């Protein structure tokens, strides 16, 4: 077991995990100090906000003959590569063990780590003997705090090869020591091949086991998702060629978040390509973790030759927080589901569809038959861009992961599709189909369309009226799902084809109501009269007289009460009325004609005599026949006058000596007197209360006298102040304390007020208060 240096041990916490070697030759050397980091040019930040699926291209680095400096290059995808290089000697057969410099690594915020092994290019394929001793990889921490992780290769990890030329170099089992300084789970992937170039065509691969034991940290946060992307450019048999063929790695990554799951096994299969160097292709593995995924499918991007050999190794990992399975094997056939873009000319890229279900939360890559229209979905709070495809297929699709075929069932039309968990607006569809719930999300770029394989594109419109369409929904393009307003409940929807609908109205709001929503008791005939007369309902409610019922006179005759009183018809029951402002000319002509016939036609019916109230009489007389002129509809009795000689009434009892009239009039007078007395009593009481509480107006008189506060004039106030000052001077001369002086002044002020009130009472002794 390796001995950790004191410098490194002082930096590590107590709960650091312990690793044990499974080698036959346990190394005795201790860890060397971490090497110095390379210049800042080797650090290239990873670009995570890309509009397509991230693809990783391998990188080959050309090494100098004797130089020990590692030069790292990156591809156009701006990925961060950690490239440990080994120094190879071409002049001597026995090379001294050297410790190459490892460029430092900075992990981006999305916790991606890419380790790329670079093949060394020697001058002579048969003149180099390689010794690898004391290599150490300094990897930045995958946690947020950025604590380092040490991947150390001890000095005696293999025996130096002594063969020359085409001799075989057999590597010994490798011991890798991983040290982490954080309480987060870290995945370490190691390969069985040597980390440096070998000049021999035959390489013996060995299996090595890495045991990692770690105490689970006490944390309340959710599981941390780490993305690990490994790209390798393996050695080639011909070292004189400038490039090498990278292997195709296909795999399936399943993340288990349960802390009590059994240990899982990591199997890594490598492929050394034997095709010529001019047919170099790129190996890309895209791993895009969800926010909290439980299944993740890794799909190979490039194809490979069927005759290439395969090497595998097993690394059991025991992680306390959760076990992860990484199975990377070689597949002889091309995977039908491919993602990303490739630089190879023989590869065919197929668009994929991503369907995310929040309950089980798995991500499946499904190939499509035809390239459809692609819609970009902006998910708030996510670092990745998702692409939504609007055309679906009915057949089942296969995803090849590690040589096994997984057949996914066909997408059902009634399957709920979740596009954004934050928006939960359920829109029920009521056609003669299977009901489904669609979660719409307003987009500014394209419309959201619910499509199935059997039905064409449909537009969902409500069958019932909506109270109001929201202004932010009016800017959506055609084909957008309209949700009902809050409080309307479950309403029916009519599904119409999209070609029949041109666009959604663009005003700020559109109110869709029915006639049942109007809450008014006004009949339609009265509404027509209101529109003709131009009067409001509030004015009609305050109307004091009876409405007219004219039907043929157009309200232009004297028997129309409105016309006879010189008023316009207001809220009347008349038909074809001309007694309004709209027919002012016809009305003026009718008035002139009536005045020509009777100059006093428009005078009041009850006129005054010359000598007083007793001479009041009706101008035309009444025409009562059955009431005896003792009802209110008799104009003479209503006006409290007796019928005169001009009246044409029959059985009249409204005369001076009539006992019936006297009885009725006495009762009416008694009632009127009683009402007047009650009104006077209420008025007197209210006036007295207001006088006692407020006394705001001095205009109230009491029989010519004055109220007490009217005597407080300017002179009286000055005299009162003089009395108060005199009392203060006397208290000062007698050396009275301050409290006693204040008391004397207040007593003097009370005596002054008492004098004012008594003087006012003497002035109005003969005039009692009758206010």
Curated annotation (Swiss-Prot):
Amino acids binding Zn(2+) 5: 622, 636, 643, 647
Q: Where is Zn(2+) 6 annotated to bind?
A: 629, 643, 649, 652
DNA-binding as annotated region, ranges: 546-559, 622-635
Pfam families to which the protein is assigned, alphabetical: TCR
Point out residues bearing the modification Phosphoserine. Answer: 288, 292, 308
One molecular function GO term is: metal ion binding
Keywords from UniProt, A to Z, are:
Activator, Cell cycle, DNA-binding, Metal-binding, Nucleus, Phosphoprotein, Repressor, Transcription, Transcription regulation, Zinc
Keyword field contains Nucleus: yes
Q: Where does Zn(2+) 1 bind?
A: 548, 550, 555, 560
Q: Where is the composition biased (Low complexity)?
A: 72-92
Binding-site list for Zn(2+) 4? 622, 624, 629, 634
Site positions for Critical for interaction with target DNA: 559, 633
What is this protein's function?
Component of the DREAM complex, a multiprotein complex that can both act as a transcription activator or repressor depending on the context. Specifically recognizes the consensus motif 5'-TTYRAA-3' in target DNA.
- Protein name per UniProt: Protein lin-54 homolog
């Amino acid at each position: 077991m390796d001995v950790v240096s004191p410098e490194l041990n002082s930096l590590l916490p107590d709960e650091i995990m312990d690793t044990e070697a499974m080698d036959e030759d346990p190394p005795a050397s201790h860890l060397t100090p971490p090497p110095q980091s390379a210049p800042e040019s080797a650090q290239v930040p990873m670009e995570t906000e890309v509009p397509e699926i991230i693809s990783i291209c391998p990188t080959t680095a050309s090494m100098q003959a004797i130089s020990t400096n590692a030069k790292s290059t990156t591809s156009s995808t701006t990925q961060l590569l950690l490239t440990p290089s080994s120094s190879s000697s071409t002049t001597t057969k026995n090379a001294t063990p050297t410790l190459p410099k490892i460029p430092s690594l900075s992990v981006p915020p999305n916790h991606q780590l890419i380790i790329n092994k670079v093949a060394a290019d020697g001058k002579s394929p048969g003149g180099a003997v390689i010794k690898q001793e004391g290599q150490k990889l300094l990897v930045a921490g995958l946690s947020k705090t950025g604590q380092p992780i040490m991947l150390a290769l001890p000095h005696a990890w293999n025996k130096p090869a002594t063969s020359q030329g085409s001799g075989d170099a057999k590597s010994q089992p490798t011991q890798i020591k991983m040290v982490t300084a954080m309480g987060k789970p870290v995945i370490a992937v190691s390969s069985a091949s040597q980390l440096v170039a070998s000049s021999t065509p035959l390489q013996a691969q060995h299996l090595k086991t890495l045991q990692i034991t770690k105490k689970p940290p006490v944390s309340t946060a959710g599981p941390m998702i780490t993305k690990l992307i490994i790209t390798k450019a393996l050695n080639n048999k011909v070292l004189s060629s400038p490039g090498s063929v990278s292997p195709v790695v296909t795999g399936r990554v399943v993340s288990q978040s349960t802390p009590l799951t059994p240990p899982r096994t990591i199997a890594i299969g490598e492929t050394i390509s034997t095709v010529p160097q001019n047919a170099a292709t790129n190996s890309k593995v895209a791993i895009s973790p969800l926010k909290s995924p439980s299944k993740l499918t890794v799909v190979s991007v490039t194809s490979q030759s069927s005759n290439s050999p395969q090497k595998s190794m097993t690394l059991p990992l025991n992680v306390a927080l959760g076990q992860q399975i990484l199975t990377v094997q070689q597949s002889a056939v091309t995977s039908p589901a491919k993602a990303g873009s490739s630089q190879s000319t023989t590869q065919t890229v197929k668009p994929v569809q991503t369907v995310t279900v929040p309950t089980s939360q798995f991500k499946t890559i499904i190939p499509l038959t035809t390239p459809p229209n692609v819609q970009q979905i902006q998910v708030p709070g996510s670092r990745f861009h998702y692409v939504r495809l609007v055309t679906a297929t009915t057949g089942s699709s296969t995803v090849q992961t590690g040589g096994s075929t997984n057949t996914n069932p066909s997408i059902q039309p009634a399957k709920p599709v979740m596009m954004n968990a934050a928006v939960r607006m359920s829109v029920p569809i009521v056609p003669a189909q299977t009901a489904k719930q669609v979660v719409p999300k307003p987009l500014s770029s394209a419309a959201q369309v619910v499509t199935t394989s059997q039905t064409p594109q449909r537009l969902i419109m409500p069958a019932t009226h909506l109270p109001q369409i929201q202004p932010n929904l009016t800017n959506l393009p055609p084909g957008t799902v309209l949700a009902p307003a809050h409080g309307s409940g479950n309403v029916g929807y009519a599904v119409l084809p999209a070609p029949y609908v041109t666009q959604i109205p663009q005003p700020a709001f559109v109110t869709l109501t029915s006639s049942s929503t109007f809450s008014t008791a006004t009949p339609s005939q009265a509404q027509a009269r209101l529109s003709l007369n131009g009067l409001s309902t509030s004015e009609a409610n305050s109307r004091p007289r009876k409405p007219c019922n004219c039907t043929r006179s157009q309200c232009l005759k004297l028997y129309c009460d409105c016309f006879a009183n010189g008023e316009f018809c207001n809220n009347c029951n008349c038909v074809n009325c001309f007694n309004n402002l709209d027919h002012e000319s016809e009305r003026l002509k009718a008035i002139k004609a009536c005045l020509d016939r009777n100059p006093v036609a428009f005078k009041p019916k009850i006129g005054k005599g010359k000598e007083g109230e007793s001479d009041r009489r009706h101008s035309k007389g009444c025409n009562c026949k059955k009431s005896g002129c003792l009802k209110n509809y008799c104009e003479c009795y209503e006006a409290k006058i007796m019928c005169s000689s001009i009246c044409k009434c029959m059985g009249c009892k409204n005369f001076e000596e009539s006992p019936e009239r006297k009885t009725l009039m006495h009762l009416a007078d008694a009632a009127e007197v009683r009402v007047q007395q009650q009104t006077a009593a209420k008025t007197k009481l209210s006036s007295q209360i207001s006088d006692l509480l407020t006394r705001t107006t001095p205009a109230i008189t009491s029989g010519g006298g004055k109220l007490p506060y009217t005597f407080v004039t300017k002179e009286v106030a000055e005299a009162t102040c003089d009395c108060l000052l005199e009392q203060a001077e006397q208290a000062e001369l007698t050396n009275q304390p301050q409290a006693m002086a204040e008391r004397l002044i207040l007593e003097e002020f009370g005596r002054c007020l008492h004098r004012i009130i008594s003087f006012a009472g003497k002035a109005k002794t003969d005039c009692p208060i009758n206010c």
